[in-house]
């Protein structure tokens, strides 16, 4: 049961409490500042990137996908599957467009017509 307005006036319900695990108002420190503050002089690996300089590339190239060593038959099979999925997406999209058109252009409207495009 709801309380009357007079009973609710003195008790704010949605105000956060100050001691509920919220951090203090001190600004957060960067990772480099904490290292310098503790006395360690450790150079970060990405030091050049935050100064506007490009980071050094790694000496060995990384393989981004294991698909480089596929048989041509597997590639053709994958392409066929992608084509099948695109056709299915196209059919479902057309189905939704048709349903939307029917809803907007039906003669029995339970709601006012919206003239948005």
From Swiss-Prot:
Family to which the UniProt record says this protein belongs: Belongs to the TFS-II family. TFA subfamily.
Record's GO cellular component terms: nucleus
Bias kind Basic and acidic residues: ranges: 41-82
Upper lineage: Eukaryota, Metazoa, Chordata, Craniata, Vertebrata
InterPro entries (UniProt xref): TF_A-like/BEX
Residue segments, region Disordered: 1-82
Pfam families, alphabetized: BEX
Coiled coil: 73-100
Biological function: May be involved in transcriptional regulation.
Alphabetical UniProt keywords: Coiled coil, Nucleus, Transcription, Transcription regulation
Primary site of residence: nucleus
Subcellular localization(s) per the UniProt record: Nucleus
Protein's name according to its UniProt entry: Transcription elongation factor A protein-like 8
């Amino acid at each position: 049961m709801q309380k009357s307005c007079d009973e609710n006036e003195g008790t704010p319900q949605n105000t956060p409490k100050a001691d509920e695990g919220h951090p203090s108002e001190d600004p957060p420190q960067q990772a480099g500042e904490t290292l310098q503050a503790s006395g360690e002089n450790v150079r970060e690996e990405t030091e050049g990137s935050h100064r506007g300089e490009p980071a050094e590339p790694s000496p060995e190239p990384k393989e981004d996908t294991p698909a480089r060593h596929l048989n041509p038959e597997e590639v053709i099979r994958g392409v066929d599957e992608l084509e099948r999925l695109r056709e299915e997406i196209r059919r479902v999209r057309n189905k939704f467009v048709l349903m939307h058109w029917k809803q907007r252009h039906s003669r029995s409207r339970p709601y006012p017509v919206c003239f948005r495009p």
